[in-house]
Design a protein with these regions (language model features):
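Non-catalytic, usually N-terminal nucleic-acid engagement modules in DNA/RNA processing proteins
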Residues: 1-184, 297-300
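Structural signal for hydrophobic packing residues in well-ordered secondary-structure cores
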Residues: 136, 167, 171-174, 178, ...
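Glycine- and acidic
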Residues: 149-152, 157, 217-223, 332-335
Length: 377
């Protein structure tokens, strides 16, 4: 399923096999289509052209709309959105704890009010697994609690202990669902999630415990939620030695181009983030020289592509001046072109990281780009 084919320090070059789409080359950036669509008018066919290997959709949102039962009746998420590559679905836990209101947490799960219409919903480990089974994703994420930052130590400890018990229940229900004769995807995999807030001892203890459960991969969750970047890196460095070396490692919700490079340097294989699409919709674009705001007046007569070093469909066809005009005119096309460029950049970044690992020069790549890509131009 997962094979490390080369290492440089902690950085890993790997291959990951899925039921859909064959082999994924890692490190990989997963393109976020929360509601089975990329915000900005980008469809599944565009994703192929943009170099996407894995698409990520959200259990919470799809459960509310259109309903996971609808997706199941349509043949699963792959058929529903016409995407033939791998799909990862997150468990809904993060959204329950960040979007929903009036939450009540018990050992069984969480009762909360929908952010759409306020109706009461219960979600626990079994419910999350059933929803993700209906969606038929390649990778299902375990149901967990993502605590607020900062979190009190005692609460973080109780929470990660409960998340461990929830993972055991997720695993049992996931195995049961995969064995059903009418399973949408009987080969669906399950990833466990490490929690523990910013406390290294809790993080290490929790990772040691969940590693005993036979999951197909493991994620580090609960980061990039307001803690300083150096704290995030410290937690990754503390947890990584306890993550099974023969299974993929996923850093959830991260992050900037520099974060991805630094995450790879610390042994991470999978990344996802809404940043490329979200920033794009506000005119903030990534280039190999740093980040730019295409709305700036200095680009009004600039006939160069967004990034002369980029060969994405947007940079091959349109000028900075034109894209700036689209934003000024509030044309929907502005969002589509900007999102396409940023997603291509992120997918290309992952490819260049893989290429540097193949060539044995990842540290050179890291030195050249980790800081540069954080600059504003």
């Amino acid at each position: 399923m997962f094979k490390v084919i080369k290492k440089e320090g902690r950085a890993r070059r790997g291959e990951f096999r899925c039921a859909h789409g064959g082999t994924v080359q890692t490190p990989v950036f997963m393109n976020v289509g929360t509601q089975a669509a990329i915000k900005g008018g980008v469809d599944a066919f565009d994703l192929h052209d943009l170099g996407c290997q894995i698409e990520l959709s959200n259990t919470y949102h799809l459960h509310l709309r259109p309903g996971d039962d609808v997706v199941r009746q349509m043949g699963g998420l792959h058929r529903f959105m016409n995407w033939d590559g791998p799909i990862l679905t997150d468990s809904g836990g993060f959204q329950v704890f960040s979007l929903a209101s009036l939450r009540k947490i018990t050992e069984e799960g969480v009762t909360f009010a929908s952010h759409l219409d306020g109706h009461r919903i219960f979600m626990g480990p079994e419910e999350s697994m059933r929803i993700q089974s209906n969606l038929g994703s390649d990778i299902a994420m375990a149901f967990d609690e993502c605590v607020e930052n900062p979190a009190q130590y005692d609460y973080a400890k109780a929470s990660c202990e409960r998340t461990l018990r929830w993972l055991e229940r997720c695993k049992a229900e996931h195995d049961r669902l995969n064995a059903l004769p009418d399973a949408v995807n009987p080969h669906q995999m399950l990833f466990g999630i490490n929690q523990g807030a910013t406390y290294e001892d809790l993080r290490i203890w929790h990772m040691q415990q969940i590693a005993k459960i036979d999951c197909d991969g493991f994620a580090i969750g609960g980061l990039a939620v307001g803690e300083p970047t150096e704290v995030m890196y410290r937690i990754i460095e503390a947890v990584e030695p306890y993550m099974p070396a023969h299974k993929p490692r996923y850093l959830m919700g991260v992050g900037t181009p520099s974060n991805i490079i630094e995450g790879v340097a610390r042994g991470v294989d999978f990344f996802d983030c809404v940043m490329p699409a979200r920033n794009a919709r506000h005119g903030k674009l990534f280039t190999w020289q740093g980040a730019m705001n295409i709305k700036n007046a200095k680009y009004k007569l600039d006939d160069r592509p967004i990034d002369p070093a980029c060969d994405c469909p947007v940079c091959r066809r349109f000028s900075r001046a034109y894209v700036r005009h689209l934003f000024a005119a509030e044309e929907i096309l502005a969002l589509r072109l900007a999102v396409m460029h940023n997603l291509y950049f992120y997918n290309k970044l992952a490819q260049r990281i893989r290429d540097s690992l193949d060539a044995g020069c990842f540290e050179d790549f890291r030195r050249e780009y980790s800081e540069k890509l954080s600059r504003r131009i």
